[in-house]
């Protein structure tokens, strides 16, 4: 991968709401090159329609919706990603959907890494009493990750800053091997 918007990864991460004794879902899309979480869904359910929605919003956010530039979207074989709704959205949006083989999370390493970070630095440090609290805390953490979290692989810059440099200068300082 040599630039932004070539390969995006999408996956789910569960979180627990102790005060309500139930789980919530975080579905995130990451750009493999700049590590920006382009869009995400936080909810008490997580279905193919949610995956389709954040994919379309990601294309809008990256200003790709009215261009011919399209990333490949890589996922595992979760029910959200093999659903007719998501597959139809990929076709309608002209996005190639690549599914990794079962039991190979290393092939989705960048989104898995982000989900490990959010587990360690957000979920494990907070006991959520309500869905509202979980939603607020996770949203704030994602904002922190995108705008202030320093990545060694991004020359010690936060993803958003690195993204701006790449887009504004055309600088592509490295190749990401996937």
Provide a role label for each language-model segment.
Residues 91-95, 117-178:
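C-terminal domain-tail junction helix/linker
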Residues 69-77, 91-110, 126-131:
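RNase H-like polynucleotidyl transferase catalytic core
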Residues 31-42, 51-54, 60-61:
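Electropositive, glycine- and tryptophan-enriched low-complexity nucleic-acid-binding patches
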Residues 1-7, 104, 158-167:
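Basic, flexible linker segments flanking DNA-binding modules
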Residues 1-28, 53-57, 61-62, 68-70, ...:
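Mobile-element integrase/transposase regions
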Residues 64-83, 105, 155-160:
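Acidic/histidine-rich, metal-coordinating catalytic segments
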Residues 85-88, 92, 109, 113, ...:
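Generic alpha-helical secondary structure signal
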Residues 26, 47, 51, 74, ...:
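Hydrophobic (often cysteine-bearing) scaffold residues that line and stabilize catalytic clefts
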